[in-house]
């Protein structure tokens, strides 16, 4: 038996002209329709799930009436397996369904025949490709056959193609809106009927996809486990976690963003004295500079050349206790108690050691020619001369012991003094400014030959003159001899020996800087500062020698 094709739209339009089928041949036609559906719908064989194809019940031949008489005629459409339903079959309870999935509608009757020829003449490979494409398309869309009723025909003529197309679309939209469930029909595969829901194919496809996804997910899980094991091995290999070795930014100590100090080249370091380019004077030095300046400016200009600025070492004595003062200070300062006095004197062993130290210092190679050393042995006689019209004068006559000549005859006037207390050192300091005025020629020394002196001092002195610092170091051993009064029966008192260390500033250099202070104050400040620096060196050296001798305990 020749296989029949599927019902086309042309057959539906011309269903009135189709001849009726014989009742005896209904079963045969039914099998031909199923075979034709399998031939035209290969997706039912290739698809993993069942393809639903509705079988059409036997249809009686339509009866057409005309005005001349009730005559009926039957005729089979060429190459059709099922005839179109009449108007009477539209109201049946179980109408047959028409398959449109694999049927291409042609609106031109002339083009349909060549298309049939192409389908018949197509190669087996093309048919196979089309079958595979149709099967995959059906799987993806998960399409189900929809029951569709053939459009009603009119008695006068055929239904236009456009109206039939609109009717089909309207039926489909209504079914989608109303949620009509499509029936599942059995399909013959290899001579066996298998009825499975259309959802099974979708679940099978999802299972296949889930298998591939599960494989990829298993691989990613294994990779993540390997990464975690690697991180754990790295953490176990180190003694501490990384966050302790490299603390986070919020746990680090603050560091200034300016890195100017890091840019300093320590190999060739040149520091400025300060941001202004000079060293500011400390308070003590500034106080002494101001004090000297105020004293000099108070002296008459013609007498300034006889000024003597001396620094001596001793202990500041409290008159109430006859002991060294002990103010509540911890560093060197200016002591302003006017009742306190200081007697210039140092310990004999300290004096000898310091004299040896200065001598060795002057004999160093780098100091050769910088020191001028002068030894002298003189006798000083002091006189207090009092007149009715003038204030008392203190005269001092200096005579060379070795030659007996008068070396100096002067009037000494004390102008001012300042006491510097040094709690960390063994000795304090006194800076005094005095005038050593020469006695006029009309008042010769012989005039005071019969006068009784107020003091007699034998001085054995060694002077170290350092011109580069404008300082003279006098290391003097003084023997104070008592003065005998007219009572000859009294015993001569014992002499008192003191050891004095003095520093004297170069007066011409000081006065020169003082005169130019308005134009250049740096020279004056430098001379006074250098004088104080030398005094600090001497004071600290005396303290260190005293510590070495007495093991840190001061001899008071």
UniProtKB/Swiss-Prot annotation:
It holds the Pfam family mRNA_triPase. Keywords: Hydrolase, mRNA capping, mRNA processing, Nucleus. This is mRNA-capping enzyme subunit beta. Belongs to the fungal TPase family. The lineage of its organism: Eukaryota, Fungi, Dikarya, Ascomycota, Saccharomycotina. Its EC number is 3.6.1.74. It catalyses: a 5'-end triphospho-ribonucleoside in mRNA + H2O = a 5'-end diphospho-ribonucleoside in mRNA + phosphate + H(+). It comes from the Eukaryota. It comes from Kluyveromyces lactis (strain ATCC 8585 / CBS 2359 / DSM 70799 / NBRC 1267 / NRRL Y-1140 / WM37) (Yeast). One of its GO terms (cellular component) is mRNA capping enzyme complex. Residues 1-28, 56-217 are annotated as: Disordered. GO terms for molecular function: mRNA 5'-triphosphate monophosphatase activity; polynucleotide 5'-phosphatase activity. First step of mRNA capping. Converts the 5'-triphosphate end of a nascent mRNA chain into a diphosphate end. InterPro entries: Cet1/Ctl1, CYTH-like_dom_sf, mRNA_triPase_Cet1, mRNA_triPase_Cet1_sf. Residues 103-131, 139-212 have a biased composition (Basic and acidic residues). CDD domains: CYTH-like_mRNA_RTPase. Residues 85-96 have a biased composition (Acidic residues). Residues 63-74 have a biased composition (Polar residues). Its main location: nucleus. One of its GO terms (biological process) is 7-methylguanosine mRNA capping.
